[in-house]
Amino acid sequence: MAGVVKKSFESPDERRTPDKTDVQVVNLGSVKAARMTLQPGWRWSECIKPIAGTESCQIHHEGMVATGHMHVRHEDGTEMEIGAGDAYVIEPGHDAWVVGSEVFVGYEFDSKAAETFARS
């Protein structure tokens, strides 16, 4: 593999489009990265839970928010809102939803999340 690799989310290797969800995945060799575009009204427990088949999201997320806001509620009782410019880590065992009328766009670079989130 080359020492420098570049791919564009405008031409993703894979695209997933569950309800109110658009996930573009690029394969950078040893790492997969994802751009998640979530529409107002998106909620994990409504849009992704039917695909995942679990009571809460069991994916470990590491990423950053480009636009919009999302509220995250973890099974351990912690809750937080993340927004544009924030970097985040979200452990497995959570629900999340878009806050307000702005589209949420987040980028994730954890290979497991990019590889499996919103996959049917």
Regions found by a protein language model. Give the residues of each.
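Short beta-strand segments in beta-sandwich/barrel cores
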Residues: 43-44, 68-73, 96
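Ligand-binding loop in jelly-roll beta-barrel domains
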Residues: 91-117
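Glycine- and acidic-residue-biased ligand/ion/polar-headgroup-sensing regions
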Residues: 50-76
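Conserved GNAT-family N-acetyltransferase fold
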Residues: 36-38, 63, 88
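Short acidic-glycine-tyrosine-enriched beta hairpin
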Residues: 74-93
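Catalytic core of non-heme Fe(II) oxygenases with the double-stranded beta-helix
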Residues: 27, 42-57
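A short, N-terminal "cap"/entry segment at the start of jelly-roll beta-barrel domains
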Residues: 1-37, 45-46
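Short beta-strand segments
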Residues: 34, 78-80, 105
